[in-house]
Design a protein with these regions (language model features):
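Core alpha/beta nucleotide-donor-binding catalytic domains of modification enzymes
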Residues: 1-159
Length: 159
């Protein structure tokens, strides 16, 4: 591994949580954004065993471009690739949820399904500081109490 800031952070995180990267199969949730592409690059450079999944919620004009990018990166590097199109607007309306809550619920249900069906140990998602801030605000607005102030957990269950 190159000795740089991000490699050191990842290495520390894996060691802190006793994650043996040599004996674990990972599933990376890759959106096509910079944070998840960096995660993909890190796993690729370190030759970890991983597959990639991509959710297309069809909420932005660039959704199809993101899907093409992530699929192309995966195929070019012989990485197993999973993708799914979601009709989140319909699901959110039917279940009286915000788009964010509906997307979160549906994607994690799908992620769990992939993990189980493919005997994959751990899901990795990439987040930047704004994602964490949004989570804290969302949790505060939805009255989660002090637990919500902590934002996105570093590790929970198999995620």
């Amino acid at each position: 591994m190159k000795n740089n800031y991000y490699n050191d952070k990842f290495t520390y995180l894996f060691e802190k949580h006793n994650i043996d990267t040599n004996n674990i199969k990972f599933l990376l949730a890759v959106s096509g954004g910079l944070d998840s592409i960096c995660l993909f690059d890190f796993f690729l450079k370190n030759k970890f065993s991983f597959s990639v999944c991509h959710c297309n919620f069809n909420l932005r004009e660039d959704s199809k471009k993101d899907l093409k990018l992530v699929k192309k990166l995966s195929e070019r590097n012989n990485i197993s690739f999973f993708s799914k199109n979601f009709d989140i607007k319909k699901y959110a309306k039917k279940n009286k949820l915000s788009l964010q809550a509906a997307a979160r619920k549906e994607r994690y249900k799908w992620f769990d399904n992939i993990l189980e069906k493919n005997n994959i140990d751990l899901l990795c998602t990439a987040h930047h500081i704004n994602d964490n801030l949004e989570t804290v605000i969302y949790n505060l607005v939805n009255s989660t109490g002090f637990r919500g102030i902590r934002g996105i957990k570093v590790l929970r269950k198999n995620i």
